[in-house]
């Protein structure tokens, strides 16, 4: 891959594998099938809409991951907006750990000017009236889901190449939190799996 080509990337805080992740993924998939909306892996965006050469992205993400310890994120209320990428989601409770992680990412990428960080975990992306989103939340008992799970452990940052078309999102690499920030081998990208593989937990 030509690392001089600029692309848009997103860094996600990804839940540890286990029953909670599987239940969240199944919920996203079920809503997707019923309402013909995109499916995607459960995640909390740490920072998005970052452009630059891919190798630089990997080096900076390694630095970020080395400065953040594994953490738990606690679920709050179910919310929805008229924005496509904030259609229906679980609010993540603000803590020093989650705000600190976002601060590290913004500093490394020189994006301190961004609006206040609002951590959340999306369950659906859709263009539909807010009232319909509310009815879907009730239909699937999403507030009960959030309360039952309570919180999830976060053990890695996942880097995705993203665009307005969710179907074209592509997983690039995972970085374990607290890992050593070593130089990235230019040949790291031999695994070309897409985000879709996240469905097979």
Give the label of every model feature segment:
Residues 155-166:
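Short beta-strand segments and strand-loop junctions that repeat across beta-rich extracellular domains
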Residues 1-74, 95-148, 165-201:
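Basic, often amphipathic N-terminal segments
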Residues 85-87:
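A generic structural signal for beta-strand entry/edge sites
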Residues 72-82:
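A short, structured active-site edge motif that brings together acidic residues
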């Amino acid at each position: 891959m030509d690392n001089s080509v600029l692309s848009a990337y997103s860094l996600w805080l990804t839940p540890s594998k286990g029953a909670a992740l599987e239940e969240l993924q199944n919920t996203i998939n079920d809503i997707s099938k019923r309402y013909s909306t995109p499916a995607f892996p459960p995640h909390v965006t740490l920072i998005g809409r970052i452009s630059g050469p891919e190798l630089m992205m990997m080096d900076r993400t390694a630095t970020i991951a080395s400065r953040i310890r594994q953490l738990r994120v606690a679920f709050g209320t179910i919310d929805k907006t008229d924005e496509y990428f904030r259609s229906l989601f679980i609010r993540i409770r603000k803590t020093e750990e989650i705000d600190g992680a976002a601060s590290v990412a913004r500093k490394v990428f020189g994006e301190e000017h961004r609006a206040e960080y609002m951590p959340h975990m999306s369950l659906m992306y859709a263009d539909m009236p807010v009232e319909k989103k509310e009815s879907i939340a009730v239909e699937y008992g999403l507030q009960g889901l959030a309360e039952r799970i309570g919180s999830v452990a976060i053990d890695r940052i996942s880097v995705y190449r993203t665009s307005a078309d969710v179907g074209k999102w592509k997983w690039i690499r995972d970085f374990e939190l607290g890992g050593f920030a070593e130089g990235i081998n230019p040949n790291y990208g031999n695994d070309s799996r897409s985000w879709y593989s996240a469905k097979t937990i």
